């Protein structure tokens, strides 16, 4: 992908993440951002997906009504790149070639993506809760225990979003006029 196109994709997808974060700001830990970052990594590679994740948190984490904390901003920015890297890694492993858009494969792919979304979110929540404990000077175990309800909500909602959203988003990206995926996904 050409550098101008890469920058455009990063800008547009980052804007989509930030916009959906603000749209869902009243719903704690329920966001489309992780799904968008993962699909961006899957569709455009780990570098693009990770850049979208980090930039989203740099914008959203700085201009956030919940306040600003540098250690937590660092952890969320770093943590969000995990989704982009995972999507890019699965792309390199050929997952795009195995992702079907036929009705018979949607359920199977949805379950796989839900499991991936749940696992990535568990890692993200662990990292960010550890950063919260550190930045607040609190013992780690009580912070992790107190975070369980929020983490479960985040993990389950992401599993649902990944189950329902990965294949349709990839399908939409495939339809873009100059999408690199058009060539890669012709056989799908």
Predicted regions and their residues:
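Hydrophobic transmembrane alpha-helices of multi-pass small-molecule transporters
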Residues: 35-38, 57, 61, 80, ...
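Hydrophobic alpha-helical transmembrane segments
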Residues: 7-12, 35, 39, 50-54, ...
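Hydrophobic transmembrane alpha-helices
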Residues: 1-43, 47-51
